[in-house]
Swiss-Prot record:
Enzyme category, top tier: transferase
Pathway in which this enzyme or protein is active: Nucleotide-sugar biosynthesis; CMP-3-deoxy-D-manno-octulosonate biosynthesis; CMP-3-deoxy-D-manno-octulosonate from 3-deoxy-D-manno-octulosonate and CTP: step 1/1; Bacterial outer membrane biogenesis; lipopolysaccharide biosynthesis
Catalytic reactions on record: 3-deoxy-alpha-D-manno-oct-2-ulosonate + CTP = CMP-3-deoxy-beta-D-manno-octulosonate + diphosphate
Keyword Transferase attached: yes
Lineage: Bacteria, Pseudomonadati, Pseudomonadota, Alphaproteobacteria, Hyphomicrobiales
Keywords: Cytoplasm, Lipopolysaccharide biosynthesis, Nucleotidyltransferase, Transferase
UniProt entry tagged with the keyword Transferase: yes
Protein name: 3-deoxy-manno-octulosonate cytidylyltransferase
GO molecular function: 3-deoxy-manno-octulosonate cytidylyltransferase activity
Cellular component terms (Gene Ontology): cytosol
Similarity annotation: Belongs to the KdsB family.
Task performed by this protein: Activates KDO (a required 8-carbon sugar) for incorporation into bacterial lipopolysaccharide in Gram-negative bacteria.
Compartments it resides in: Cytoplasm
The encoding gene: kdsB
Amino acid sequence: MTEHDTLVLIPARMAASRLPGKPLLDIAGLPMIAQVLRRAREARLGRVAVATDSAEIAAAVAAEGGEAVMTSADHPSGSDRIFEALEKLDGEGRIKTVINVQGDLPTIAPADIRAVLQPFAEPTVDIATLAAQIRVAAEHDNPNVVKVVGSPLSQDTLRALYFTRCTAPFGEGPRYHHIGLYAYRRTALARFVALPPSSLERREKLEQLRALEAGMRIDVRIVDSVPLGVDTPDDLEAARRILAKQA
């Protein structure tokens, strides 16, 4: 993998029920989408673009000197949105690896974006993602904290066996909080978006289960902490405090 065959895509849309218009909300003097764009560029992995159905978001990206690609408003998931963007930006197939950075992670460490590629040293891995060890007791039983159950491959890598909102695995030992940042081999992304929603995906409301049920391999890199996702006004204020200190 090189910066010439890797594409970082940031899906972003305006329709957020708890925080309307959140990609354009100000954080430390910039729209949130511009902050995410900066973090992705700081990872220095190659071309970075925002995939959006909003002209307002595209304009904010352009104002930051970034690249935006317009996509359909009808996509059921961010994975479908980034696949459309990939096909529009690289119809020739030069890009081999795609990283999906959520558009509501303005404080994510660029090192964590780079870390998601490390499982691809193993050629049979289809999809790579991140997790961090749960250290707050209340998170073990919180259904909004998605846990990854996996077989350890090394001190900092798991092979994912399941993702769940339940408290899992049972018994003594660490549990891991899944972080929704993904890297896909291009062939794996094309296969994934062509699959219908799976039974466990619908039950847990976790689209990565579609890949596991189809026999695709997902490996998980363990990082130090979970980045702040901005979903509520309290999250927004926390992100503002974090980035104000870094300014």
